[in-house]
């Protein structure tokens, strides 16, 4: 998605440790118009799929997923919680994921009543690095017996291999911008096309 690549080039900052900071428009301050165009792009890509639910992980994927849901007939959006809460009652699906950004493992939880065997799920997230967060969402879907119809990603760090691994496993991964390389010294960002 050219517009997203341009925003990354003009407003993104490359940090040490393979970190790409895009908080001006994606995961701190949210450009809802951009999110809308991202949702439209995913709707075009996944047009042949019967999506009944969107699943993401808190927190940065929530805004993108909610706006994207409008392009899929306003299907429900479920977000996996990263911690146990008194608001989560009853049966739940739980798995553990490793966060590249936070450099730690944490549990992710979805109430069983919100993820079912009949669901055809589109996974959406802001970033895809090594694929650990998505692997956790896939595990939750498998536990529920839900079908993963596809994966929509705003920014994939292609050099970290998570997207390539998921594609090799047969998942339909649509990343709107794939960063091929980043240089924290020069700030240079190159994209895969």
Swiss-Prot record:
GO biological process: purine ribonucleoside salvage; xanthine metabolic process; XMP salvage
Glycosyltransferase keyword on record: yes
Chain positions recorded as xanthine binding sites: 20, 27, 157
Keyword terms, alphabetized: Cytoplasm, Glycosyltransferase, Purine salvage, Transferase
Source species, domain of life: Bacteria
Pathway(s) the chain acts in: Purine metabolism; XMP biosynthesis via salvage pathway; XMP from xanthine: step 1/1
Intracellular or extracellular location(s): Cytoplasm
Stored InterPro entries: PRibTrfase_dom (IPR000836), PRTase-like (IPR029057), Pur/Pyrimidine_PRTase (IPR050118), Xanthine_PRibTrfase (IPR010079)
GO cellular component: cytoplasm
Enzyme Commission designation: 2.4.2.22
Molecular function terms, GO-annotated: xanthine phosphoribosyltransferase activity
Keyword Metal-binding assigned: no
Binding residue positions for 5-phospho-alpha-D-ribose 1-diphosphate: 129-133
Pfam families the record matches: Pribosyltran
Reactions accelerated catalytically: XMP + diphosphate = xanthine + 5-phospho-alpha-D-ribose 1-diphosphate
Subunit structure: Homodimer.
Family, similarity comment: Belongs to the purine/pyrimidine phosphoribosyltransferase family. Xpt subfamily.
Function as written in the Swiss-Prot or TrEMBL entry: Converts the preformed base xanthine, a product of nucleic acid breakdown, to xanthosine 5'-monophosphate (XMP), so it can be reused for RNA or DNA synthesis.
Name of the protein: Xanthine phosphoribosyltransferase
Organism: Bifidobacterium longum subsp. infantis (strain ATCC 15697 / DSM 20088 / JCM 1222 / NCTC 11817 / S12)
Gene that specifies this protein: xpt
């Amino acid at each position: 998605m050219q517009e997203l690549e341009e925003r990354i080039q003009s407003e993104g900052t490359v940090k040490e440790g393979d970190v790409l900071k895009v908080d001006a428009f994606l995961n701190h301050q949210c450009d809802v118009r951009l999110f809308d165009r991202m949702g439209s792009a995913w709707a075009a890509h996944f047009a042949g799929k019967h999506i009944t639910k969107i699943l993401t992980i808190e927190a940065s994927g929530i805004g993108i997923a909610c706006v994207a849901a409008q392009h899929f007939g306003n299907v429900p959006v479920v977000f996996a919680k990263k911690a146990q809460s008194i608001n989560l009652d009853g049966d739940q699906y739980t798995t553990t994921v490793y966060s590249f950004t936070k450099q730690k493992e944490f549990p992710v939880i979805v109430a069983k009543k919100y993820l079912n065997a009949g669901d055809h799920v589109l996974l959406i997230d802001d970033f895809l690095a090594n694929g650990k967060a998505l692997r956790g969402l896939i595990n939750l879907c498998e536990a529920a017996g839900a079908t993963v119809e596809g994966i929509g990603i705003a920014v994939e760090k292609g050099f970290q291999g998570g997207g390539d691994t998921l594609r090799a496993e047969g998942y339909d991964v649509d990343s709107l911008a794939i960063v091929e390389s980043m240089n924290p010294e020069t700030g240079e960002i190159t994209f895969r096309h």
